[in-house]
Amino acid sequence: MEKQSSRRGLLKNAAKAAVAVTGGAVLASTAKAQAPATLEKKSYPAKPRTDPSAAPPLFSSAVSYGNLVFLAGVGYHESGTIEEATKHVLDELEKNLQSAGSSMEKVLKVNVYLNDIKDWARMNTAYAGRWGQVPPVRTTIAPAGGIPGNSLVEIDLIAYI
């Protein structure tokens, strides 16, 4: 009797595994069928090249791929408060999003880099309310070496178009 029940258990497990594999194959083929035939990567240079002999830019200020847009970090390299710096950075990001055909309401992910983590609460006062009804997910860090260009804050993001 024990051999028979262990065989039944083995057969049940094999049947479950077959269903799982078949279901996975169906899902994979469905996803493949729904994927666009070609996705085009579009880059928006950080600074337009006026001199063709000049070296190419190190990075793009924005890159879109499919219906996603990735914005490079924007900082504020002037003197001022963290609130002023954050407002300026968010205003610049909003302009960049609009140029790419998106908006602050369509932002999915934000990375905030603070020169000093003690500015976190004050940065949040300028940050709040800029994203529509559903704010994006966010990570905030204070890099040990600070932010290049002595900015109080730098923000990059990912949005959809």
Question: Predicted regions span which residues?
Answer:
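Core FKBP-type peptidyl-prolyl cis-trans isomerase
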Residues: 84, 105-107
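Phosphate/pyrophosphate-binding loops at sites that engage ATP/ADP/AMP, CoA/4′-phosphopantetheine
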Residues: 97-105
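Short, well-ordered amphipathic alpha-helical segments that serve as non-catalytic structural scaffolds
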Residues: 84-98
